[in-house]
Amino acid sequence: KIVLLLAIVSLVKSDQICIGYHANNSTEQVDTIMEKNVTVTHAQDILEKTHNGKLCDLDGVKPLILRDCSVAGWLLGNPMCDEFINVPEWSYIVEKANPANDLCYPGDFNDYEELKHLLSRINHFEKIQIIPKSSWSNHEASSGVSSACPYNGKSSFFRNVVWLIKKDSAYPTIKRSYNNTNQEDLLILWGIHHPNDAAEQTKLYQNPTTYISVGTSTLNQRLVPKIATRSKVNGQSGRMEFFWTILKPNDAINFESNGNFIAPEYAYKIVKKGDSAIMKSELEYGNCNTKCQTPMGAINSSMPFHNIHPLTIGECPKYVKSNRLVLATGLRNTPQRERRRKKRGLFGAIAGFIEGGWQGMVDGWYGYHHSNEQGSGYAADKESTQKAIDGVTNKVNSIINKMNTQFEAVGREFNNLERRIENLNKKMEDGFLDVWTYNAELLVLMENERTLDFHDSNVKNLYDKVRLQLRDNAKELGNGCFEFYHKCDNECMESVKNGTYDYPQYSEEARLNREEISGVKLESMGTYQILSIYSTVASSLALAIMVAGLSLWMC
């Protein structure tokens, strides 16, 4: 009995080393291919959901915010848009959905949507005079005004074009050319007036039948006025139609007309090309700076995805329709609960055989807990932890870099004749967004599964590293722990952790202790067998006496 008791006490006080992993108070949850809402020690949100609700400078360059003016009102020079007569370089253009100051004289702007698309590749215009207003000596250049375009309570007209009227009851045929001697392309605008009736035609232009011819090396245009009775818009029954072209360097534009001509006075020299956009937004300027702008506000984020608005300008995350994208960077967070029986202390283990993580180990993801006569403590395995951190960091950065390539996310505009094309374009863009969203969500699910498996594998590798060193000098307890068959002081424990454990040095002591424990087990088994036989014989004898007594009594 004394030998058995000593053996049990010896077992309780045996030195131990355990392999485990970090745990903390995190409540972060991620989804994987196999599971939802897995709690992890560390996670990284890769979906930006916030913006500042302002229009900002883009990389230090201010946007051109047209306020109540449209692009057409700005380019033609609506009198109510005088603040935009000369504008500095812009990063992007902001136009309201329904600006009040558009074409003050009712009409149409030909290929307007195409012009807006052109502006999405331009960052700066320089306005230059190409045909001075004072050069029209045979025509009335100052009488072409309208109450539809008021300025300071008086009739006015677009600032950048001239509405030519007959002079002294005559409208001589115009033949005027302009040669682009600049090194830059020129944006030139002109127009035609469509009167309400024949009386207005002769009143303004004298000639009942008129035309306008415009030609460049790439353009051959002939226009005739469309005289028709129309309902009034802005008090006008007439209409104006405006046109534009890009005149290349060393090319010339030629105008010929005998009436109804709205001549260019100013043109726009395209002095800087680059990525720009025309963004529809009602926001105000916020005196801020950003790398990514949306119609809802600026995004300042290094995340690879956002769900704020599909239209963006700048270095932006990719838009997806998801509400949540979280990457696991740490381990499954399963803190081990303290047990009632504390003979072994807090020991944990990995998926499959380790019961929980250690909150006491704070300086690494994987590591050890040891206990011996000198005490106990946690120690992180710095090498495996650092390799894991590098691997996860590289993976996250790789995902961000891979997903940073974005298709053009600036909306296109279509005229009324192109609605079917617009609908098709929207369906295609919606399809792209659906694909990107699916890819992003699938990528996150797969990477989270791989990350958690990666951590499990690292802990298992650390366990195997210890197991292969100790061999039969220690016993595997099945919960991530090893119980030594020999005394293992702190120096011995450190050698196990750093991989320099000397198996032969401790093998003899371990063998003797192992044999002693085996002997105690055998002796205990023999004692229990004797007691069992004795108990059986005694019980049988008592039963026989009782049966005999009963027989005599019955006789």
Swiss-Prot record:
Entry superkingdom: Viruses
Disulfide feature: C18-C481, C56-C288, C69-C81, C104-C149, C292-C316, C488-C492
GO cellular component terms given for this protein: host cell plasma membrane; membrane; viral envelope; virion membrane
Keywords for this protein: Clathrin- and caveolin-independent endocytosis of virus by host, Clathrin-mediated endocytosis of virus by host, Disulfide bond, Fusion of virus membrane with host endosomal membrane, Fusion of virus membrane with host membrane, Glycoprotein, Hemagglutinin, Host cell membrane, Host membrane, Host-virus interaction, Lipoprotein, Membrane, Palmitate, Signal, Transmembrane, Transmembrane helix, Viral attachment to host cell, Viral envelope protein, Viral penetration into host cytoplasm, Virion, Virus endocytosis by host, Virus entry into host cell
Signal peptide: 1-14
GO BP field: clathrin-dependent endocytosis of virus by host cell; fusion of virus membrane with host endosome membrane; fusion of virus membrane with host plasma membrane; virion attachment to host cell
Example GO molecular function: host cell surface receptor binding
UniProt site (Cleavage): R344, G345
Membrane topology: Single-pass type I membrane protein
Cellular compartments annotated: Virion membrane; Host apical cell membrane
Gene3D superfamilies according to UniProt: 3.90.20.10, 3.90.209.20, Hemagglutinin Chain A, Domain 2
Cytoplasmic side: 551-555
PTM text: Palmitoylated.
InterPro entries: Capsid_hemagglutn (IPR008980), Hemagglutn_HA1_a/b_dom_sf (IPR013828), Hemagglutn_influenz_A (IPR000149), Hemagglutn_influenz_A/B (IPR001364)
Lipid positions (S-palmitoyl cysteine): C555
HAMAP family on file: INFV_HEMA
Record text on subunit structure and interactions: Homotrimer of disulfide-linked HA1-HA2.
UniProt similarity note: Belongs to the influenza viruses hemagglutinin family.
Note: Major glycoprotein, comprises over 80% of the envelope proteins present in virus particle. The extent of infection into host organism is determined by HA. Influenza viruses bud from the apical surface of polarized epithelial cells (e.g. bronchial epithelial cells) into lumen of lungs and are therefore usually pneumotropic. The reason is that HA is cleaved by tryptase clara which is restricted to lungs. However, HAs of H5 and H7 pantropic avian viruses subtypes can be cleaved by furin and subtilisin-type enzymes, allowing the virus to grow in other organs than lungs.
This protein's name: Hemagglutinin
Source organism of the structure: Influenza A virus (strain A/Guinea fowl/Hong Kong/38/2002 H5N1 genotype X0)
GN (gene name): HA
